[in-house]
Amino acid sequence: MKTKAPMKNIRNFSIIAHIDHGKSTLADCLISECNAISNREMKSQVMDTMDIEKERGITIKAQSVRLNYTFKGEDYVLNLIDTPGHVDFSYEVSRSLCSCEGALLVVDATQGVEAQTIANTYIALDNHLEILPVINKIDLPNANVLEVKQDIEDTIGIDCSNANEVSAKAKLGIKDLLEKIITTIPAPSGDPNAPLKALIYDSWFDNYLGALALVRIMDGSINTEQEILVMGTGKKHGVLGLYYPNPLKKIPTKSLECGEIGIVSLGLKSVTDIAVGDTLTDAKNPTSKPIEGFMPAKPFVFAGLYPIETDRFEDLREALLKLQLNDCALNFEPESSVALGFGFRVGFLGLLHMEVIKERLEREFGLNLIATAPTVVYEVHLTDNSIKYVQNPSELPPENHIACIKEPFVRATIITPSEFLGNLMQLLNNKRGIQEKMEYLNQSRVMLTYSLPSNEIVMDFYDKLKSCTKGYASFDYEPIENREAHLVKLDVRVAGDVVDALSIIIDKNKAYEKGRALVETMKELIPRQLFEVAIQASVGNKIIARETIKSVGKNVTAKCYGGDITRKRKLLEKQKEGKKRMKAIGKVELPQEAFLAILKID
């Protein structure tokens, strides 16, 4: 490890890109060019440390790496902060960008600007970052560099006449890019002699060192002899260790200077003690006020998670607590369901976040889980003028107690090739969307801005968007406000009992259609019983759809050979009596597929 560089030779930058535009590959190239990792240890997507990240080709957890580079005889330190590209993880992007002075805006030369790129670039511009446009994948035969440059200028308004053209796969233009980073991105500003002020922009749990904070030193410096005050909690802790970030191993250091990025170990048991966005300062000589402008991540989607083996409830709690150590956006509370037993109501940032958490619980902790239909938080105004916030359909008060229900809306930005515009607008209308703006970016691409109910996008909107545009559309959203809506609770009754885990809150006009589809699907999935089973969809006390599963008949007259008909009739009557009694007391076991099917029904 080379000696520390002066503050004027430090560059802190991040990479903004949409999924699949080559961000992790470009990060690999920069790491390789600066020899931060030996060729023997280098592997693709080195910044993506989770198996799920590599398999899905996405970045979930923002990583950082310290690179050394010599330019014109001077040693520079380049701190690269890798950011996720998916809409669910935009909170990771915003906090990573707060610790940088510049950002590389990476755009695929074959695809042009996408919705998520625009959203993250605006976050960077709000933080006054220097933006360097980078056109990636220029070696592909269908690359259209000039059109993409024009696209960036028209959509975002950044001058692209000197944009760097690179191919991360073929390692073209990487040296020029590194030199451009040094000459264009400003050095960090801050006062090295002021009291310590460090921004926590990420935290995670290490099995050996406890909760670790990834920090950017804004003012002053930190060393291993110091006592640190966490300003959010008001607690003081000794510094157990300081490290420079590297994807393969942490590099120990005795101090972190102003403008640097590093890892601080305070020997804490949980990341809740070092919340992201909090400020670290010197306990003996504290800074006057913490760093402003950080908001905790708020869950957007809620779902129930239940273990299939009911005795593994405590294992699920342990697993969620462990994941929460690394994921400050994950929150959960216990809940119980008549149909599914004990489980947890879990809050997620979005559907991908929910999928990733469920997959990690199953893969890393060996749990088998049932997830209920995802919901959002509704604002329910009651007739006694009070307001109740409901995230679980079973908590919705009776209809005669409700004055009105308000549901959260989002503003969605969608960029699509113009040939799919008709299909897309039809989908948005089906999802109760309200068009706000439509603008042609060029002859072949359109940007649509719609306001949509959050409830409509948490189910299957993303999949439907991709299928109706053959995968070419990109989508981003931001929450706006709660608006009044005509919503009802749709219940599913099996053999007369309400299955609370299958209840959903839905637009009144869609209730019949959804109810019919639900009971038809359930009829296919529930095995036949020894008694007749009625499956009903109801709104309040009104049954709106019904299907019946016929009973399995046992041939009770098989042993009668000819003889008197009254003997057979007596046996059949006895069987009918038994079935009637069974129907009154019998319970129907619902297969897991029934709960999964509700997510798939349009």
UniProtKB/Swiss-Prot annotation:
Pfam families named among the record's database cross-references: EFG_C, GTP_EFTU, GTP_EFTU_D2, LepA_C
NCBIfam families, sorted: lepA, small_GTP
Residues the entry annotates as binding GTP: D20, H21, G22, K23, S24, T25, N136, K137, I138, D139
Membrane topology, as annotated: Peripheral membrane protein
Residue ranges annotated for the tr-type G domain, each copy included: 8-189
Record protein name field: Elongation factor 4
InterPro entries according to UniProt: EF-4, EFG_III/V, EFG_V-like, EFTu-like_2, G_TR_CS, LepA_C_sf, LepA_CTD, LepA_IV
Origin superkingdom: Bacteria
Gene3D superfamilies named among the record's database cross-references: 3.30.70.240, Elongation factor 4, C-terminal domain (3.30.70.2570), Elongation Factor G (Translational Gtpase), domain 3 (3.30.70.870), P-loop containing nucleotide triphosphate hydrolases (3.40.50.300), Translation factors (2.40.30.10)
Record's function text: Required for accurate and efficient protein synthesis under certain stress conditions. May act as a fidelity factor of the translation reaction, by catalyzing a one-codon backward translocation of tRNAs on improperly translocated ribosomes. Back-translocation proceeds from a post-translocation (POST) complex to a pre-translocation (PRE) complex, thus giving elongation factor G a second chance to translocate the tRNAs correctly. Binds to ribosomes in a GTP-dependent manner.
One annotated Gene Ontology cellular component of this protein: plasma membrane
Catalysed reactions listed for this entry: GTP + H2O = GDP + phosphate + H(+)
Family: Belongs to the TRAFAC class translation factor GTPase superfamily. Classic translation factor GTPase family. LepA subfamily.
Organism taxonomic ancestry: Bacteria, Pseudomonadati, Campylobacterota, Epsilonproteobacteria, Campylobacterales
E.C. number(s) listed in UniProt: 3.6.5.n1
Originating species: Helicobacter pylori (strain HPAG1)
Subcellular localization, as worded in the UniProt entry: Cell inner membrane
Gene Ontology molecular function, alphabetical: GTP binding; GTPase activity; ribosome binding; translation elongation factor activity
GO biological process terms, semicolon-separated: positive regulation of translation
Keywords: Cell inner membrane, Cell membrane, GTP-binding, Hydrolase, Membrane, Nucleotide-binding, Protein biosynthesis
CDD domains with a match to the protein in the record: EF4_II, EF4_III, LepA, lepA_C
